[in-house]
Every structure is written in structure tokens, then in C-alpha cells.
């Protein structure tokens, strides 16, 4: 079966490794576009929805085609020719979730209207039954995307609420990091079991929590199952997911994870989130200043940070000072094999701080985060 996933653009390399670890065979990676196409068996559906830490949505690919000067009639014909009786039961409702990118003489609303009509007519042809449409809470979500001249039609196995919404969060920081990006940064750091992980500006605790979930082999889908659910259950039932759950072996090991923040309110919220995620006992939350790390710690193996960008929190001038002093302090507690991973939208300002503190940039790349272009830096001494 063919599939495609969506994720934060820029993190395709990390999600590719995750898909392959689940047994998926990569067919195409859309670099910096947040899409990966692959194939595999049905088990991939519950595996990715329940176990993936870096992917936001998984879809079954029903049709993909380049159509020069694509028109609404082209969309109708391709959608009409799909056997919808295979995916939608007679008593189920459906909804089209359209997406359009590029220059066209139609809107995404037009795509939704035409595709919806095609599904209804196609089903009537095959079953002599008119399917129900439910735009708010459909049983089956059909994704119809027109990306320039390409038409992509798929069944959404995740649902309207993407996988980055884990379900454990009870406290929201005003600039909290997307959970799938946080997990991707932890993967990037190659953090070992016996190493210390420090987030010096932890906010609501996303990075420490995602790191702890990873080390304890706690599936991220565990907390969203009852809160948000998974759309594939409506199509395939619980059997596939139950089989995956039986294979999971969690552990209660204690790992060296520290979340630091100078705002006690954020720390209290982070503790609540960690408690909900069943990892509070392995994370030490400390009130402290990211520019004075040497006063709290002798050394750290892995530092991962999502510092303020000066957009939602802090002014540009204060951010520049923070970056300079943070890197200066981080350098004092790093050793030869330490890694420092930072994500920021103020990459020019951060590059100045890197140069000023003589760090080596091992890797850097762009990541789209909430409509904002950010840059990830992997630094060593």
C-alpha cells in the first residue's frame, strides 16, 4: 500500500529514518516541503500514528498525478474514478479537506466542492447510496491537494488534530515548541542513555518530556488516544492498534534530564505536563538562568534549546544579549564530545553569537515552525 506523511518542512531526513525503522520503503522525499511518500503494509498505519515522534499526519495515498494546467474537471474525474466503497462504509459520513498551492483559476473551496460531489456520485454509481457529508466530525477524512500541477488524493488516517498534539499538555507556554520538532532535535543530538540532557530555557518542558518519553519507550500516541483519537480506527477498527500495543515494552529507568527556566510559573506548568506524561520522576526542573549555567552545572553532554526569538517574548536587543551570554555560559560546561542544538528564527543574530564564542557549526538547516522560518544549529566546541 502507498502512503504519504506530512511533517514540519526541513525535518524530512529525521522522519525518513523513523519511517524506515517502522518498515516503510521510501519512494520520494520532498525536501523542505514537509512530505514523504513511501510504501508498506497495513501495520504502518497504527505504527506511525501511535509510535511516530516526528510525523504530524499520515495518509493513505489513493491517487497522485501531474496534470499540466490542472482544472476542476480533472479533479472531478480522478476522484470519481476511485473506488470509495473500499474506504467508506454505507452508514459513514465523510468530508473533503482541500489544500491548494500555486496559481490556479479556482480556490480550495472549489476543490472541496467538486471533490465532494465526485465522491458522492461515485458511491451512488457503485452502491446506489448517497453518502452523508459531515464537515465538523466526519467518520472519514479525504485529503484532496493541488500543489501547483500535481493532484494528490488520500485518506487521512490521523484526523484533523495532528500528531504533534500529544494529549499530555495541560499547561501551554506562550511560545512552546511543537512536540514533533522537539523530538526531532533530540534524535538529531544522538543523546545516549548515560548522558545528561539539559534544556536551559525549557518553558513548558516539551524538550525534556519528549526526550524522557523517547528513552522510556513510551509511545506518544498513548496520551492522545482517548483525548483526540485516530481516524484509522473508524476504517480498520482496533485490531491493528491492539497488535502494535502488545509489542511495546516501556521502562521506568531514571535518566539524567534537566529542564531549567528562570520563570517559576513556567516550571510549575512544565511539571504538570511531565506528570501527565508519566515522566516527572526522571526530569529535574530547576529555576535558573540560561546565561549562568556554570553556576548550576559542572558539565553537560547534550544541550538542546528553543530560546526566545524576540517575537512573542522579549525584545530584539534583549535577545541578542541573551544569545551572547547563553553561548558563553554553555561553553563553560561543555566538553570535547558535548553537543549543543538550538532552534531560532533569529539566525543572523545567533550566528554572530556563535562567531563571538568560537563554536564549530557541525550542521545547520531551516525548519518551518508554525508559519515561521527557523534555523536549527548543531554546535560543538
Curated annotation (Swiss-Prot):
One GO term describing the cellular component: cytoplasm
Superkingdom of origin organism: Archaea
Binding locations of S-adenosyl-L-methionine: 173-177, 204-206, 261, 289-290, 306
Intrachain S-S bonds: none
Domain THUMP: 43-157
Location relative to the cell: Cytoplasm
Protein name: tRNA (guanine(6)-N2)-methyltransferase
